[in-house]
Amino acid sequence: MGRSAFGSRTRMTAFVDLAARLAAEPADAALKDVVLTIAETCAQISRVVASGALSGSLGAAGSTNVQDEEQKKLDVITNDMLSDALKACGPVAGLASEELEEVEPTGRVGGYLVTFDPLDGSSNIDVNVSVGTIFSVLPAPAGHAPTEGDFLQPGRNQVAAGYAVYGPQTMLVVTLSGGVNGFTLSADGRWLLTHPDLAIKPDTAEFAINMSNQRHWAPAVRRYIDGCLQGKDGARGKNFNMRWVASMVADVHRIMMRGGVFMYPWDAREPDKPGKLRLMYEANPMSLLAERAGGKSIEGLNEILDINPAKLHQRVPVVLGSANEVEVIRAEMRAG
């Protein structure tokens, strides 16, 4: 063992790598191949993100995506990286990206379908704030090439889900067979298990929400946040802290590490839209991770994982995190 620049001993050999950890999972070998392909691509994306302006990859791409949002150059680059890798992965029958209007069959039948947000929080990339990649894996139909309808499965059908967060460290958080595990990308490009069996604390005094939208919220959301802001002098009897990064990956990762609730509710700015976040690319995979880590995830009254999708780019409101606090919010929603 050597010493780092700070004098502490390095013990990289003490950590289990992703391939070895997946080998211990009871999941299908083909599914493990899909997860490894995504993980390897996320490691490559991490290097591209880290190079920033040095590679000329910052700034706008001069185009919009299917959501009519301005694309960053890295949105396009990372989407192409994941799309190319998954098309070359044998068990993948089809893929769908937040950045693309239609699903992309690979020409194969059976195996798995993958949905992904290639660079969540990309509006932060030019100011060097954490961004990430979110992915979901679903079973593919056995008898035909997949169509859009085959992707429209409830979140409980997911066979794997995860995200990579590109921050001070690059981490991969993933679930396959039941538990949730966190891996850190080493300097030599290996995913090493540093956070086994992640669990979200059931109680919290921390919430994540965009307070600038307060005047547009439904009464139940305003009541809940007002109660938090009253602190120990109010009915809740304790002080709360607020955190908001405007990158779902970063905000949810903090909750996975230390508890809290993430809220992106419906608001009156666009009353005909049920929410901002995409069910298939963001809400479903994050909800599976949250539930398997002991947390909860609801759209207001009901569990997000029970939603039957109506369309590929469907949006939903999201309340996710510490189980007991999510129930407090659900009770406010029931009160109207």
Curated annotation (Swiss-Prot):
Name of the top EC class for this enzyme: hydrolase
Regions annotated as coiled coil: none
UniProt keyword annotation of Heme present: no
GO biological process, one term: sucrose biosynthetic process
UniProt binding sites for substrate: D120, G121, S122, S123, N210, K276
Cofactor(s) in the UniProt record: Mg(2+)
Cleavable signal peptide: none
Main location: cytoplasm
Keywords noted in UniProt: Carbohydrate metabolism, Cytoplasm, Hydrolase, Magnesium, Metal-binding
Keyword Zinc: no
Pathway noted in the entry: Carbohydrate biosynthesis; gluconeogenesis
NCBIfam families (alphabetical): PRK09293.1-3, PRK09293.1-4
Subunit comment: Homotetramer.
HAMAP family noted in UniProt: FBPase_class1 (MF_01855)
Identification of the protein by name: Fructose-1,6-bisphosphatase class 1
Designated gene of the protein: fbp
